[in-house]
Amino acid sequence: MASLNVYNLPLDKRLTKHLLRRACFQYSKAQLDAMTGKTPAEILTQLNVSKSYAWNWPNDPVTNGSGANPSCANKQDGYWLNDTNWQNNSYTCRQGPKRAMVAGWWWYNVIKQNTLIDKLTWFLFTTFTTAKDDGAGKAGHFFDYINLLQFYSDKSVKDLARKITFDNAMLYYLDNGDNNKNSPNENYAREFLELFTIGK
């Protein structure tokens, strides 16, 4: 079994590549050359520095057609998550495309940012998972869920497990609205514990 002692020696190119492949989404030859010869702690500190890149907000520029919901006609949502003048009357419109926009927004920004926090957020996304397509509910719920994962990515997993039980996307994904006191296997708590914490 590998030692659990902190490895404080400078990394050669092979070990630096190994660390970078696991700690970020991509790296350049210039980054590899600059980090080779540094200790793991120095490299991780460098990867934790936020870039000056400003995150753009998800934007829905499309005018909603009438489709199956006539109340959606001729409404543009634009930056619906952070627009203080946005009217909530079209919130039910285009939730599928909006969830896809949030997912695309997240991926675009993490690739640009490319920090350890982003890689850890992705790890938590694959651990405390919900479904992007209808499984997370409204697009705003999916957006909040990603931000929750990002906030706790370098903090306590126990705290995240507690907080995520109040998250709308997770509650929707695990059918909290369908709890049944007469069927112990059909409730949110059992599903959450089995899937994400203690198992069966």
Each language-model region and where it sits:
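N-terminal module-boundary/linker segments of secreted carbohydrate-active enzymes
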Residues: M1-M101, Y108-T115
